[in-house]
Regions:
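Outer-membrane beta-barrel transmembrane domain signature
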Residues: 26-33, 96, 100-103, 107-212
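Short hydrophobic/aromatic segments of transmembrane alpha-helices and their interfaces
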Residues: 4-5, 46-47, 162, 208
């Protein structure tokens, strides 16, 4: 399953003619295309593990900076756990390279997290990094394939460090040049060294973004 989504997306892309890959709106929230200097976008996503609201601003042609607020009902995407929690994160995206047919970027979203379970509060720090590839399939459709490592650590006598390794893909459909609807999927194991075990983690989120 972990290999299925990226494999299907790659197969579809290889079947497209070269001219179909030379288009796009020139920006993205989920993929690697940055917003552009001076542009700002608001975004919202909902699904599993929760609700996320974000704002992102283009400080240069290759760098976006912003922030995110998340209210989760699934603990960091663990499919077996439904503890409510909140996260406050910074948001950095750096475009590494870009051509007419593909772009590459790194993201970093650090910030504190709090989960509430049976009257206790687990406090931790999220330090997620991700590598994403963006492919403009048409003027209205952007595909992304990514490897995410949303590392986080809980303080005190709690869970300790958690090392998720998630893969997957996503789609952004541009309703017009400023408005996009999206779906993003990542899944994989979340390794918990202190427990000597792992949990299956998944992010499946529908979203919308507006750039101005």
């Amino acid at each position: 399953m972990k290999r299925l989504v990226p494999g299907l997306l790659l197969a579809c892309l290889l079947a497209l003619p070269g001219t179909a890959l030379a288009r796009g709106q020139g920006w993205s929230i989920l993929a690697a295309d940055t917003l552009g200097r001076g542009n700002t976008a608001f975004s919202g996503q909902i699904g599993w593990p929760g609700l996320t609201l974000g704002v992102l601003h283009g400080t240069s042609e290759k760098v976006d900076i912003g922030g995110k607020f998340s209210f989760n009902w699934g603990r960091e995407g663990w499919v077996r756990h439904t503890s409510p929690g909140i996260k406050l994160q910074g948001w950095l995206r750096v475009e590494l390279a870009k051509t007419n047919s593909v772009s590459f970027a790194l993201t970093f979203q650090p910030g504190p997290l709090f989960y509430f379970d049976d009257g206790d509060t687990d406090v931790g720090l999220a330090l997620p990094v991700a590598f994403v590839v963006g492919i403009p399939v048409s003027s209205a459709l952007m595909v992304n394939v990514g490897l995410d490592m949303p590392f986080h650590v809980y303080f005190g006598r709690s869970i300790g460090p958690v090392i998720p390794i998630l893969v997957g893909g996503g789609l952004e459909y541009f309703i017009d040049s400023k408005l996009a609807a999206s779906f993003n999927l990542r899944m994989g194991p979340a390794l918990i060294p202190d427990w000597d075990e792992s949990e299956f983690a998944m992010e499946a989120l529908f979203g919308i973004a507006y750039r101005f």
